[in-house]
A protein has these predicted regions:
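All-alpha prenyltransferase/terpene-synthase fold signal
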Residues: 1-324
């Protein structure tokens, strides 16, 4: 089995060799910029790790893995534009370095580049991998639409929110794992269990992101703390705050959410104080643990030697205890 560090090194090496040589250069500079910002590279890493569980060689999974990473960064580029985010990985976002129109068009070019890379999948697995990716891409768009619609709703349920983050975040992790498994020669049953593992770990991952947006550190998180609060984004914490708040707390939350002009630090502090009063940090951590426990059961169902799953388990354990 390849070490996680070796897999990451291979991914970074392959990304650095990606060439966008078609004119005009200005269309592709933002793509090179966002890919150069780094990141966890967890999606391509999951693809290669899943492949490696079933096959000593990961070569046939390299290009599809790169395609999934390019696609992921495309979603971030458009996400940042829609959220009007200033920072991504502690660097200015694409629409801040260039402009909104450039971010839209370069993002479109990234989506095409992702399809080109995934289209390089070996013929025997091409249809299944491409179908899975296309379904995933459509689901992610649906998740983003739900996310935007939730911003103007005050009655979003926890169940609706979980479905939204399943679509927006978890399905791509699941797709990455299943793609790697299929290319490694896994059975359909094992590929399905790895997909379910990806869903559960993805839900835990996004809930951890919600938590870090409130309780993280800007220096390590790579994004401004409280960004979701400032945008009135319906996160797991806000949805449960609105559900559990007493009359006074509910009025305070709604008052802040209705304000068009406010001091950002004061709004973040006000929300955080109410979250603390309602013990939402613990509630969120309990939910994260539940999805993590479910993901462990998915791995136990795999028809492989337990030692082959050691690296995958270690990486996911690290994700669940991250600060960035």
């Amino acid at each position: 089995m390849l070490a996680f560090e070796n897999i990451l090194q291979r991914i970074e090496s392959e990304i650095s060799q990606l060439q966008f040589t078609n004119p005009p250069k200005s269309l592709y500079e933002p793509i090179e910029y966002i890919l150069s910002l780094g990141g966890k590279r967890i999606r391509p890493a999951l693809t290669l790790m899943a492949c490696n569980i079933y096959n000593n060689s990961i070569e046939n999974a390299i290009k599809p893995a790169l395609g999934l990473e390019v696609f992921h960064n495309f979603t971030l580029l458009h996400d940042d534009l829609m959220d009007e985010a200033d920072k991504r990985r502690n660097k200015p976002t694409v629409h801040k370095v260039w402009n909104a129109n450039t971010a839209i068009l370069s993002g479109d070019a990234m989506l095409i580049a992702a399809y080109q890379l995934i289209g390089s999948t070996e013929h025997g697995h091409l249809k299944q991998v491409l179908d899975l990716f296309t379904q995933t891409a459509a689901e992610i768009c649906g998740g983003q639409q739900f996310d935007m619609e939730f911003e103007s709703r005050m009655d979003v349920s926890e169940e609706e929110y979980i479905e939204m983050i399943r679509l927006k975040t978890a399905v791509l992790l699941a797709c990455s794992l299943k793609t790697g498994a299929l290319l490694g020669g896994a059975s359909q049953e094992d590929a399905g269990n790895l997909y379910a593992f990806g869903i559960n770990i993805g839900l835990a991952f996004q809930l951890q992101d919600d938590l870090l947006d409130v309780y993280g550190d800007t220096a390590t998180f790579g994004k401004n703390i409280g960004g979701d609060i400032l945008c009135n984004k319906k996160t797991f914490l806000l949805i449960n705050a609105l559900r559990l708040a007493n009359k006074e707390q509910a009025e305070a939350l709604r008052s802040w959410m209705d304000k068009k002009e406010f001091d950002p630090a004061q709004k973040i502090q006000a929300f955080t104080s109410i979250y603390n009063e309602l013990q939402l940090k613990q509630l969120t951590e309990n939910k994260i643990q539940a999805y993590y426990d479910a993901s462990v059961e998915n791995l136990k169902a795999l028809q492989v030697a337990p030692e082959k799953l050691t690296i995958l388990k270690e990486v996911c354990d690290h994700l669940m205890h991250r600060q960035s």
